[in-house]
Regions:
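Active-site metal-coordination segments of metallo-dependent hydrolases
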Residues: 139-157, 340-361, 406-409
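Non-catalytic terminal regions of proteins
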Residues: 423-489
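Membrane-interface, cytosolic juxtamembrane amphipathic helix immediately N-terminal to a transmembrane helix
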Residues: 18-45, 202-237, 263, 276-313, ...
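Active-site-proximal gating segments in proteases and membrane effectors
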Residues: 2-11, 165-195, 260-316, 338-348, ...
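Transmembrane alpha-helices and immediately adjacent membrane-cytoplasm interface residues
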Residues: 91-138, 148, 152, 161-167, ...
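Hydrophobic alpha-helical transmembrane segments
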Residues: 56-76, 93-117, 264, 306-333, ...
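Hydrophobic transmembrane alpha-helical segments that form the core helix bundle
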Residues: 224, 228-357, 454, 458-473
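Peri-catalytic and regulatory segments of divalent metal-dependent proteins
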Residues: 9-11, 15-17, 125-235, 281, ...
Length: 489
């Protein structure tokens, strides 16, 4: 849909909307904000629920490690038998579940999930530190400061400063990239260290009014707190991607070395390690970048996802982790892909609408952003993977980072964004249409069926994980526990 074909003139036959058909930008911003926070709340509930399940599934591993630590201490000085204490605590619930009060069940569930939740909280903090240390959350070497002697670049700096004044924000630092792309993006943790990056090609193509629309969208995203919200969403999704990555590298005879490399990248987030791990977390089951490098003849590859080799006695030593890690990892990966990422993407689509409406509020010119979006359409190219969601338009072909790997696009289509701008006064030919009621009912029924199937699959995964935990974790731990207690007497 070309905007040049839908101008407001007699020849085009375009009929301006009436006042009743239009929507002021304050109402649009409030409406999209409510929708975004509703989906965000659903995403937070889903993430919390999934975190509790993942933490509970990993509980046997944590309690086994703690109990074995008590058993080792018991070899030197008397120490409590944690297995016996746990048996006394959960024995009545297993023997007579109908007699257990709901509060007691809640207490047992909290005790089961507590070690895993503490572990996940520590990992979240480490992942956030790693992502901030990674070059993927900054413009990197592709950016350079604006050249004051270049007219187009100085115009960009002036326009961004104008939009910042209109939004009552400190002026963000403005940078330019010489890459052959037609896009703009923001970087930073919050409004205090925000950066705006626009391509030189876009500066040459847009008029000053259209550049104001793009700057209004980017500054509007800063004002709406999209950088901090995007970082929190990325950290939450990368947590489940990390669990999935651990499951993906598990059946390997060098699992110990790979796990050490992975955790060292988190705990010591040097630039190269953090960047490598951040790239891998965008596709937790894919082949790591380090795998693609050729190895010498006869030598195994050394990446985090090195080629699977024949099992040996060292692999068998890791079998007690099969239940808690492998099944939990695939559980986290599936839920991340089909539940959490789509919910986050739906919320982010509303935030893009809200940034567009904020741009109209700052510029008072809905046509400016609409014309700019039309010129940018289909011209997106990757700027940086983990900040693709902070760009003006969808970066073509870029699926890196948890926010870019969803089955639901995180950006509305160009047509939908133009129709939303039309309600704010932009000159487009067709007003947005409501979805027909029969189609709404069909989609609602389809989502209900999918929800039931997902719940059933999750239940079966929990049962399967419990069985594998009892087989691979409980049995060897029980034998080792009895042996250590016998030696301690």
């Amino acid at each position: 849909m070309a905007l040049t074909d839908i101008r407001s003139d007699a020849a085009s036959g375009w009929i301006p909307w009436t006042a009743a058909e239009r929507e002021n930008f304050f109402s649009a911003i409030a409406r999209h904000n409510r929708a975004a926070w509703r989906v965000t709340l659903a995403s937070a509930v889903a993430i919390a629920f999934t975190s509790a399940i993942v933490a509970t599934l990993m509980a046997p591993l944590f309690y086994a490690a703690i109990a074995l630590a008590f058993d080792l201490v018991n070899l030197i000085v008397p120490a409590p038998n944690l297995v016996q204490l746990l048996g006394d605590a959960i024995g009545p619930a297993i023997d007579h579940p109908e007699a257990v009060a709901p509060a007691r069940w809640l207490q047992l569930a909290l005790c089961a999930a507590l070690p895993g939740l503490v572990w996940m909280a520590l990992v979240v903090l480490a992942l956030r530190r790693m992502l901030l240390a990674s070059a993927l959350f900054g413009p990197g070497p592709i950016a350079r400061p604006c050249n004051p002697s270049a007219l187009e670049e100085q115009r960009l700096a002036n326009v961004v400063a104008e939009m910042a004044v209109a939004a009552n924000l400190p002026a963000p630092r403005v940078e330019v990239t010489d890459q052959a792309i037609l896009n703009g993006v923001i970087f930073g943790r919050d409004e205090r260290d925000a950066k705006v990056l626009v391509s030189q090609a876009l500066l040459a193509r847009l008029s000053r009014e259209e550049l104001q629309g793009v700057a209004g969208h980017l500054v509007g995203s800063i004002a709406n707190g999209d950088m901090a919200i995007g970082l929190r969403a990325s950290v939450a999704l990368s947590l489940f991607a990390l669990v999935a990555r651990m499951a993906a590298i598990f059946p390997n005879d060098a699992i110990g070395r790979h796990v050490w490399v992975l955790w060292h990248a988190i705990l010591v987030p040097t630039s190269s390690r953090a960047r490598q791990l951040a790239l891998e977390l965008g596709d937790p089951f894919g082949e790591s970048n380090s795998d693609s490098t050729s190895a010498p003849a006869g030598q195994p590859r050394s990446g985090l996802n090195a080629q699977k080799s024949q099992g040996n006695w060292r692999t068998l030593l890791w079998l007690p982790l099969a239940g808690p890690i492998v099944i939990t990892g695939f559980f986290a990966g599936l839920v991340n892909l089909f539940v959490l990422s789509p919910l986050v993407s739906l919320a982010w689509r509303q935030r893009k609408y809200m940034a567009d409406a904020t741009a109209v509020r700052l510029t008072r010119d809905p046509d400016a952003l609409a014309h700019a979006l039309e010129k940018m359409s289909g011209a997106g190219a990757p700027l940086t993977p983990w900040t693709a969601h902070l760009s003006v338009i969808q970066t073509g072909g870029n699926r890196s980072g948890p926010l870019g790997a969803s089955v639901v696009p995180m950006f509305p289509s160009l047509d939908r964004r133009l129709r939303a701008l039309a309600k704010l006064g932009a000159h487009v030919s067709h007003p947005p249409r409501r979805m027909p009621l029969p189609l709404v009912l069909i989609l609602a029924a389809l989502f209900a069926v999918v929800g039931v199937l997902i719940a059933l699959v999750l239940y079966l995964l929990v049962i399967l994980s419990t069985a594998l935990t009892m087989l691979f974790t409980g049995l060897p731990f029980g034998v080792l526990h009895l042996l250590l207690r016998w030696l301690g007497h």
